[in-house]
């Protein structure tokens, strides 16, 4: 059987148990696909007999307005993961630096091009927050550095000043700084934390973003990246297949950018439910790393995940994250009733 790295394997659960689970393993919007996006996909169906625009011109124009950046600084892909792999193929670095734990696809993409991946282990005693020592690890010879903002699975967020210093260290070493902001838009004050202001002064910076999480579009597959390095974006474009983003995904993205009321509802829900879920988990004796994201990292018995699966609830086991072990789990923050079911099921399991 093929081993899957990530959460969200609803089909695997259905095959095993013959039913669907309440899935907390995928960090997507608990409100589902916005109606306006679903309508846009339906409206785009008559164009399915045509090849999609390989340059995503309409979508990039909409993103240009939304992000306040020239369309020439935007590249779209089949999810952020697609673009992460394209970056590895474009740069072909020999040596890279990532944190541990962090999103697995950075190392996976880098290793496909023979890159040596150095992992900076984050301190559990410090709730896995990234520290100044990480900057000291950015040395000549390191050709690319990945920083996840907020980090997955810890939810920890480095300050804009820290990201600036990381960018400066990378520039001094001739390294690319790749900042993953795929979960940043869940924060009401995400604009305060983004690395976008650095794009105006740093050719070595690239930022990854995605529609997947905030808009509940995981199955549509749509992401994009931002960079002032036109040559790098062109290399990345050439490293991927020409029609990576379907017509339906492009239409969905344009529609999603108009869903400001939906985004406000998602942010309000997470802001209201996350403290309640955190309190409930801690009341059950579980250690919780709260972070700033729409998910929580928690620690409990190594048998916890399997026991919950038997009862129809799925967490993201974190044993395959370097820097964590089988006692760590990640849970999304979902709706009030869903979070209550999680807490009730945990209480049954933990006694």
What are these regions (language model features)?
Residues 111, 129-141, 153-177, 181-214:
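Active-site pre-lysine segment of PLP-dependent enzymes
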Residues 1-50, 141:
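N-terminal "arm"/small-domain region of PLP-dependent enzymes with the aminotransferase-like
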Residues 270-271, 281-312:
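Conserved PLP-binding catalytic core of the aspartate aminotransferase-like
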